[in-house]
From Swiss-Prot:
UniProt key word Electron transport: no
Example of a GO cellular component annotation carried by this entry: cytoplasm
Species for this entry: Saccharolobus islandicus (strain Y.G.57.14 / Yellowstone #1)
A matching Pfam family: HGTP_anticodon
CDD domains (alphabetical): HisRS-like_core
InterPro entries: aa-tRNA-synth_II (IPR006195), aa-tRNA-synth_II/BPL/LPL (IPR045864), Anticodon-bd (IPR004154), Anticodon-bd_dom_sf (IPR036621), His-tRNA-ligase (IPR015807), HisRS-like_core (IPR041715), HisRS/HisZ (IPR004516), HisZ (IPR004517)
GO MF annotations in UniProt: ATP binding; histidine-tRNA ligase activity
Coiled coil: none
Cell compartment(s), UniProt: Cytoplasm
HAMAP family recorded: His_tRNA_synth (MF_00127), HisZ (MF_00125)
Protein's recorded name: Histidine--tRNA ligase
Amino acid sequence: MTKFETVRGMKDYIGIDAEKIRYLESTFRDLAIKYGYSEIITPVVEEFKLFALKGGEELRETMYVFKDKADRELSLRPEITPSVARAYIQNLQSSPKPIRLFYFGTVYRYDEPQYGRYREFRQAGIEMIGDSSILADLEVLDLLYNFYDKLNLSNDITIKINNIGIFRKIMDKYNIEDNLQEHILHLIDKNKINEALDILEKNLKNKDIIDFFNKILTKKDTKLEDIESLAELEEVSRLDIKSEFLYLFRLSRILSDLNIKFKIDLGFVRGLAYYTGLIFEVLHPSVQFSIAGGGRYDKLIELYGGLPSPAIGFAIGVERTLLVIKDLKVEEPVNVIVIGMSEDTIPSMFMVSRILRKEEYKVVINTKDQPLSKLLPYYASQGFKVAIIIGKQELEKNMITVRNLITRKQISVPLENIEDAIKQTL
């Protein structure tokens, strides 16, 4: 007989594990709505080029790509931001700005499976399109911080930030074409600094700029006053990047005022090739990888054929976030088992179940043909707290018996008093 198992790198989530994912989803959804964001649901399958155009080297190598029956090259989405950008151009471009959208969905990457890395995983994220202000950046970071605060993680996490516009402006000034910029930033992201500097040296032929690159790439934990000092350097003015440092200084100062824990890492870049300004990742001391990340991508929508539109967003790794939560207690309703002692009691069993479900109880009807002496300990072992027992005598008197399966306390009451009886026994 053929035996089927999950595909490597993918996982089933059952019971409490599934409930934890749904809990994170509902927590994120409720928060995003309170910030004024509307939900967007995009297809899992998109054109390959949508992601390949500015996904970055690593992302392109790990995409699930296939051709459909019409010979179109398609891909399972490896992330959701490009889909939101495409949907914005297709449906929302004429709407008042900024557009605030949030999403929750599965993404697919053919990575080597390991702890914290899967081939199917979930992302929760937001995109704000049509606003280039520092207020937009702060709103996005504040929402991200508050999500982790709701999970009681805000004291543990650190948001690592940088302005990739520093690198972009220098390379643009010296006419380094986009694909080579992407490759250089990819090498920096993979901590292959010397390789990146070698390529820059070949293309810039300017030792002072290479030395400056090297200087900022080594500043992994930069203080606020250091950013202000860097902004005043003569070489910074000469390279026309003073505004990029001043922006980082302003943003950092306000984050400090908001008591958001962050660190400035001038050597930090992100693997996705579409970032143009602020970039950030959420770090937790218990794991070696980031659990969320995002940034500003002011040119992506224009690249996709839309009108120039600044944008910023982030994606939260749902499974990665769950890995760092020590004690996530999902509030569950009281589990109730309804047991009828004869066929005559079946209509009453269903009527009782309907009543209790309307009151948010979790109700299961017993289908086992076993004596009560076996059923009660069995359901107690399965996590049920209350048993509703309907026998012949109860049926004749329009009564029910309510039993606490933990304390074994039980009372018989008229059917209309069922909810009060459950509360009495708990």
